[in-house]
């Protein structure tokens, strides 16, 4: 996957383009957006989640139930369950799933949510609740 602003990204991109061609590259990008749509729709259609971003992006930002996103992501990592990032915007923290792996299919995306939910529900007494930002 490409990083932001790294010098060798141009070489990676050129090599990928030469290997798969323009149509192949388009297919990879389309697939990445399809997997982000699968994840976003899962979050939107599940009342236990709060979605923080809509639109055309590979990042899906959300919270699960009332759990603190930073702590949930950290504990998932230390428990060797998932490695997922968290982010913040305007004082709100959220889980930030980036669907940048072209090998992932729908089953991997759904498995991600299954693992997150199972871990959070089994460890709910050990996880902090998130603080809600009060807007004046």
Regions found by a protein language model. Give the residues of each.
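Catalytic pocket-lining loop regions of alpha/beta-barrel enzymes
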Residues: 10
């Amino acid at each position: 996957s490409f990083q932001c602003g790294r010098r060798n990204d141009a070489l990676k991109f050129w090599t990928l383009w030469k290997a798969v061609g323009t149509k192949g590259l388009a297919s990879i990008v389309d697939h990445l957006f399809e997997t982000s749509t699968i994840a976003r729709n899962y979050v939107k259609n599940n009342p236990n989640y709060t979605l923080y971003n809509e639109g055309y992006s590979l990042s899906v930002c959300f919270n699960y139930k009332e759990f603190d996103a930073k702590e949930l992501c950290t504990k998932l990592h230390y428990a060797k369950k998932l490695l997922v990032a968290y982010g913040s915007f305007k004082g709100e923290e959220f889980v930030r799933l980036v669907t940048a792996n072209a090998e992932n299919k729908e089953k991997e995306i759904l498995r991600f949510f299954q693992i997150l939910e199972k871990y959070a529900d089994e460890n709910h007494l050990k996880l902090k609740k998130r603080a809600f930002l009060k807007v004046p």
